[in-house]
Amino acid sequence: MEGMARDFIGYGGNPPKVEWPGGARIALNLVINYEEGSELGAVEGDPQREMTAEWVYPAKPTERDLANESMYEYGSRVGVWRIMRILNKYDAPCTVFACGLALERNRAVAQAFVKHGYDMVGHGYRWISHYGMNEEQEREQVRMCRESIERITGQRIIGWFTRPLKTQATRRILAEEGFLYDSDCFNDDLPHFEKINGKQFLVVPYSLEQNDIRYWKNQMFTANDFFEYVRDAFDTLYEEGATSPRMMSVGLHCRVIGRPGRAQGLDRFLSHVRKFSGVWITHRNDIARFWLERYG
């Protein structure tokens, strides 16, 4: 299927000599995944409960998991505000992978995102996988998300990240709906193009390993676990950026790194980053627009 052929080569040993604004070695994009209130659950009438959790307790799929519901609520009640305070401390721009229903249920958070100048990327109306959807269902999910976010924030949505798994039709649907890019892959340290309907479509890769969700995968425990991993990734990319500038994404979840014992990992990372010159901390939409203007 066009646009879904696997590419094992990419830029290979000759990545493009990217000229980020200001001659930066690295473009750093911090991403808040704002999903709380849009996840699966019996309270929403879903046939299954949300299984992405810090602890999974025995319960029937159609019964409410009140413990997990409260963990998600922590993210929207407390965690998101803590993350924003840390970002403000370091004057760090941020992108929000936003679920429409989540923003609808917490307008104060949506207003704060707008106030701080964060850019919005579509992440579904509900925080649900597209796997198993037909094209009509998937297109409806995309349109509902876009309409909701644009109505609440006033921002035109040009980018998208699907809760895995996407389908073979996802990227084509996004292109047909007028999106400029998606972040539905993890295969490079730089943006690249895929051909959809005979035209170039931009992909701005994301990261699931420079990502706090690893706490919920039992791969991290302390704040230093997060700090040391993302610091080492940054240091590697910054060093490589002396001759071949790179891009780095860091994924944040309000219910995860918004916890007090973990938030220090984000604080330490930003403190580390601010010691370096030649770092473009920016919005995802700005990276996409730059790439389209310069290399499209």
Language model region names:
Residues 196-214:
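A structural motif
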Residues 2-159, 163-202, 227-250, 256-296:
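Catalytic alpha-helical scaffold of carbohydrate-active enzymes acting on polysaccharides/glycoconjugates
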